[in-house]
Curated annotation (Swiss-Prot):
This is Adenine phosphoribosyltransferase. One of its GO terms (biological process) is adenine salvage. Pfam families: Pribosyltran. Homodimer. InterPro entries: Ade_phspho_trans (IPR005764), PRibTrfase_dom (IPR000836), PRTase-like (IPR029057), UPRTase/APRTase (IPR050054). Transmembrane segments: none annotated. Pathway: Purine metabolism; AMP biosynthesis via salvage pathway; AMP from adenine: step 1/1.
Amino acid sequence: MDLTQYIASIENYPKEGITFRDISPLMASGKAYSYAIREIVQYACDKDIDMIVGPEARGFIIGCPVAVELGIGFAPVRKPGKLPREVISASYEKEYGLDTLTMHADAIKPGQRVLIVDDLLATGGTVKATIDLVEKLGGIVAGCAFLIELDGLNGRQAIGDYDCKVLMHFPG
């Protein structure tokens, strides 16, 4: 199935010169959404995954159904102040400074095999910070899965040798 037909491209959003890739049409199509989830589930089946980890907010939208299909748990990664219990944090570079992500300190048990799931791989900052969080807790990052990769933004370089599944490519 060609999932690219379910992605809306919005020029100059959120700012001039940026093309935003909106996954809302994909989610609105039961056929396309379930196909995308099944593709990631199939990828995960070969990796003996114990836990899905997804950064807010669209990582929840993709990661939770994958976790349900696999019959395993989901651990959210959020911005500071959004998780109610003890957290660990990791910071990463953004275009205009640092940003921080947090995860509950007990979200991952040492040795658990984790698949990180998000909608988009661009510069790789979010996924690299998520990898750092998982590894701080002793988890093993078995792979990463994304609906979309924006080519030319060097996201793969940021995540290094971690195995990666991408369903669609768009220019960055």
